[in-house]
Amino acid sequence: MYQRNISFSDEVDIRSSRFLHLILYPRFSESEYEKRIAELKSLGITSIILDGRTIVNGIRVAGKGCVGLVVKAKSGSKVYALKIRRTDADRKTMDNEARLHIIANSAGVGPSLEGHTKNIIAMEFITGQNIIDWLDDNSEKPRIRSVARAILEQCFSLDRASIDHGELSRLARHVIVSNRPYIVDFESASTIRKTCNVTAATQAIFLHGIIASKVKERLGNTNREKVIQALRRYKNSQKRENFEVLLDSLSI
């Protein structure tokens, strides 16, 4: 949810024609429209800010996924991120995602969930950059190590809370770096499957893919064999002691 400068024209009423086909995307339904407007009102939403890096139907939004669109909204003077369920989503409500988001919040992870309805989740809006853009703008080794450790600490908290995010191998879409990193989007999370948050994030940051390549350019090589051995030890027993061994192997 990257912040850009906002002009007055970006802010519209919740009944604006510019927002009409976002509140029920991709298929508009007159019968459902008033229901979703009522949901927005129940959350205290007074206006929508059409801003973001993603374009949907010619309109800027904060994000777009398989389950929902993310738009920026206001309740009085407070700014929120709204995740609005797509009409073609693979689920009928946002209730389970909201439940999992609350569990993550209880572990100290994720933007604060402020409220939810059948079709909408309202949460704290995080002003920041995705981790790839952030790495492109930052080269200070201590800061990169600090952010990497903070991400893994949050992953450890999720592991301890028995909630698996499910998509942390794709960190660019699920971590926003502001004054600190935030893990976002719990639509694929589960409290049933085995947790592998630390494992997935470690591999994404240090071992495989574009993020790992950028981190390597800035921090230098890691001892891959030592890291892999530490990961195996942690996967076998997700104890703090083993997590500390992993952090040590990563020099963070």
Name each model feature, range by range.
Residues 33-34, 42-96, 102:
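ATP-binding glycine-rich loop module of kinase domains
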Residues 163-167, 178-252:
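C-lobe/activation-segment region of protein kinase-like
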Residues 102, 109-149:
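Conserved structural core of kinase catalytic domains
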Residues 171-177:
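Hydrophobic residue at the +6 position relative to the catalytic HRD Asp in the kinase catalytic loop
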Residues 1-59, 246-251:
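Juxta-kinase regulatory segment immediately upstream of eukaryotic protein kinase catalytic domains
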Residues 72-76, 125, 177-179:
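Active-site beta-strand termini and strand-to-loop segments that position acidic
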Residues 153-166:
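Protein kinase catalytic-loop region centered on the HRD/HxD motif
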Residues 83-117, 146, 205, 209:
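A conserved alpha-helical element in kinase catalytic cores
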